[in-house]
Every structure is written in C-alpha cells, then in structure tokens.
A protein has these predicted regions:
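Bacterial N-terminal signal peptides
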Residues: 10-18
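Exported/periplasmic cell-wall-interacting domains
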Residues: 98-224
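N-terminal post-signal-peptidase region of extra-cytosolic proteins
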Residues: 30-44, 49-50, 64-72, 80-82, ...
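Solvent-exposed coil/turn segments that connect beta secondary-structure elements
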Residues: 50-52, 59-62, 71-73, 87-90, ...
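Bacterial N-terminal signal peptides that target proteins for export
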Residues: 1-9
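Short, surface-exposed secondary-structure junctions/capping segments
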Residues: 76-100, 161-163
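Extracytoplasmic
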Residues: 40-42, 49-52, 63-65, 79-81, ...
Length: 224
C-alpha cells in the first residue's frame, strides 16, 4: 500500500468513528480512536480554540482527534507555540481542591486552608504541561469554555493523549486551524459534564487515579 493510500484509509477510519451528523454530541460512553506513531519525534499537537478540538498529528497524518474544554473568558487558554513537559499521570491541583478534617471534606483553595485542615488538590489525571500552570488533563469536557485555562480531555481519551505526547512534543494553540473544516468538522463530543460529581471522599483518594488506568493496548491497528 502506498503512503497516500494509507493516509486516505486513516482519514476514513477517523471519519466513521469521530464524525456524526448535525448532532455532534455523543450519547453513551465517549471515546476517540488513536494510532501509534511510526516516528514519535514527528508527533505534533494542534489545539483549535474555536472548534474546542485537539489534533495529534504525525506530520500530516492524524493520530488522535478529540474534543476539549477550553478556558473561560476571564481565564483564557494561552495562545502560541509551546512544548510538552512535566508529564504526571497522578497530578493534583496546587490551587483548587478540598479542605479535609475528621468532620468533613469542604471544597476550597489551597491558600485559604483553615488551621487544622489538610489540603488535598483536585485530581487532574494524565497531566501534560505546556506552560507554567497550564496543561492538558482528564476532566469533564463541557461544550462551552469552562476551565481556568487548562485543556480538559475525556477520561477515556486522556491516557491515549498522554501516551502519544512526549516531553518536547511541539504544541500549537490557535483560534482556528484548517483541520477544523476537514478532520475536525462535526467532531463527536462527550456529555460527561452532565454526570453528577463523584463523592468528595472518592476524589481525594488514590482510587480515583487507579480507576482511570487503561489496561491493554491504547492504539488501533493501522489500516492495511
């Protein structure tokens, strides 16, 4: 098979799995296909803020296309060129989390932790930092800007993104990209943001991270 034929088949696979009709919101258990790169050094990431989409590419070949939740107007996701670093599969927020005592668990900021309380940061699994204090991580993917500037990825997809992106991988964040009109058009979007929040006792536990671990191969077989 020629390289061009492989590229066309790969696009078709993404189209069948990642595209839907006019209703772009996924009903049920959300996931996104991912493919192992031939050369990890050629992997790059594009983030379209207008399309709330992440494109992981090996040169021009799509490896992963998925929805993301971006920063609010008052706390926007930074634009520009970056590189991935500080990958942490079990990251907790240094700013927002919970004040824990024997009497209860109360949401709060780290810098406002009352005396006698223990601060436990909100879980941000599969953290990939691209600028100090900003990163990709697992979380609810709302259909509107909702974060403090980070880029949230559905919990089923975040392990794949984490595996594809290495320290030093180039990341471009822009208002839009040409891919928005091709591989990113009518992208499937999760509805996990409608789910009730897990119990606070669960969020402060290691079990939260344990339950998000994906077993087995994360990647699809390349089309033959």
């Amino acid at each position: 098979m020629t390289k061009n034929s492989f590229f066309i088949l790969n696009i078709a696979s993404f189209a069948l799995f990642n595209f839907v009709g006019c209703n772009s919101y996924d009903v049920g258990n959300y996931d996104s296909l991912a493919y192992r790169p031939s050369n990890p050094n050629k992997v790059r990431v594009k983030v379209s803020l207008q399309n709330s989409a992440i494109y992981v590419l090996e040169e021009n070949k799509p490896l992963l296309i998925t929805a993301t939740c971006i920063g609010k107007n008052e706390s926007p996701t930074p634009l520009g060129s970056f590189r991935a670093y500080n990958k942490l599969p079990r990251k907790r927020s240094n700013t927002y989390g919970f004040h824990v005592t024997s009497h209860g668990i109360v949401p709060g900021r780290r810098d406002m932790t009352p005396k006698g309380s223990k601060y436990v940061g909100y879980p941000m699994p599969y953290w990939v930092e691209f600028k100090s204090g900003y990163g990709f991580h697992s979380g609810y993917v709302h259909p509107v800007p909702k974060t403090h500037g980070c880029l949230r990825i559905n919990q089923n997809v975040a392990p794949k993104f984490f595996a594809l992106v290495r320290s030093g991988t180039p990341i471009e964040i822009n208002d839009s990209f040409p891919e928005d009109l091709t591989i990113g058009k009518n992208i499937r979007r999760p509805q996990d943001y409608k789910d009730p929040d897990p119990p606070r006792s669960y969020l402060i536990s290691d079990k939260y991270f344990d339950d998000l671990e994906r077993k087995g191969d994360l990647f699809e077989k390349d089309p033959l």
